[in-house]
């Protein structure tokens, strides 16, 4: 913020020293001049309206009047709340408007057979679910029979893949195996046994 000195000629900015040691001349300030740093920032009407809303003051209303009316409104709300508390303490709570209050049911409970009474509800549910699952499994069970020739072809293909992996390792082309390749190599003996079993089984 600029510091002004007053003289008989009016306001003026005093002489100041520059960093290199030279002096700036004193400058006279014209009447009504406002320095740039003191000029208020421009705000659009929309920004002013938002600021007034956040402050809780309606546009064009005096802040003092708004503060007084706010205090009065808060006082009335507190009085009303106290009055409602007193009334609610005296009277029983009435049902909310639009809510239908049903009288206690006079219908007799449904009859339960002696067998159902003896059996716990949890076990009844488990039995019914397990029975339904058994029926579903019976219906969904695959009826097809795997062709031994096709199975043998698939197994021989797997063995060829395993042998290719082993030959690449021996040749030094591949040093590290991924998870699938490791699984294939581990299953080599099992696949060979399956091939042997299928070859020894007489074909129909």
UniProtKB/Swiss-Prot annotation:
<feature type="coiled-coil region">
    <location>
        <begin position="149"/>
        <end position="181"/>
    </location>
</feature>
<comment type="function">
    <text>Regulator of the exon junction complex (EJC), a multiprotein complex that associates immediately upstream of the exon-exon junction on mRNAs and serves as a positional landmarks for the intron exon structure of genes and directs post-transcriptional processes in the cytoplasm such as mRNA export, nonsense-mediated mRNA decay (NMD) or translation.</text>
</comment>
<dbReference type="GO" id="GO:0005737">
    <property type="term" value="C:cytoplasm"/>
</dbReference>
<feature type="compositionally biased region" description="Basic and acidic residues">
    <location>
        <begin position="68"/>
        <end position="90"/>
    </location>
</feature>
<keyword id="KW-0539">Nucleus</keyword>
<keyword id="KW-0175">Coiled coil</keyword>
<dbReference type="InterPro" id="IPR036348">
    <property type="entry name" value="WIBG_N_sf"/>
</dbReference>
<protein>
    <recommendedName>
        <fullName>Partner of Y14 and mago</fullName>
    </recommendedName>
</protein>
<dbReference type="InterPro" id="IPR039333">
    <property type="entry name" value="PYM1"/>
</dbReference>
<comment type="similarity">
    <text>Belongs to the pym family.</text>
</comment>
<dbReference type="GO" id="GO:0003723">
    <property type="term" value="F:RNA binding"/>
</dbReference>
<dbReference type="InterPro" id="IPR015362">
    <property type="entry name" value="WIBG_mago-bd"/>
</dbReference>
<keyword id="KW-0963">Cytoplasm</keyword>
<feature type="region of interest" description="Disordered">
    <location>
        <begin position="1"/>
        <end position="27"/>
    </location>
</feature>
<dbReference type="Pfam" id="PF09282">
    <property type="entry name" value="Mago-bind"/>
</dbReference>
<dbReference type="GO" id="GO:1903259">
    <property type="term" value="P:exon-exon junction complex disassembly"/>
</dbReference>
<dbReference type="GO" id="GO:0000184">
    <property type="term" value="P:nuclear-transcribed mRNA catabolic process, nonsense-mediated decay"/>
</dbReference>
<dbReference type="GO" id="GO:0035145">
    <property type="term" value="C:exon-exon junction complex"/>
</dbReference>
<feature type="region of interest" description="Disordered">
    <location>
        <begin position="52"/>
        <end position="142"/>
    </location>
</feature>
<dbReference type="GO" id="GO:1990448">
    <property type="term" value="F:exon-exon junction complex binding"/>
</dbReference>
<feature type="compositionally biased region" description="Polar residues">
    <location>
        <begin position="120"/>
        <end position="130"/>
    </location>
</feature>
<comment type="subunit">
    <text>Interacts (via N-terminus) with mago and tsu/Y14; the interaction is direct.</text>
</comment>
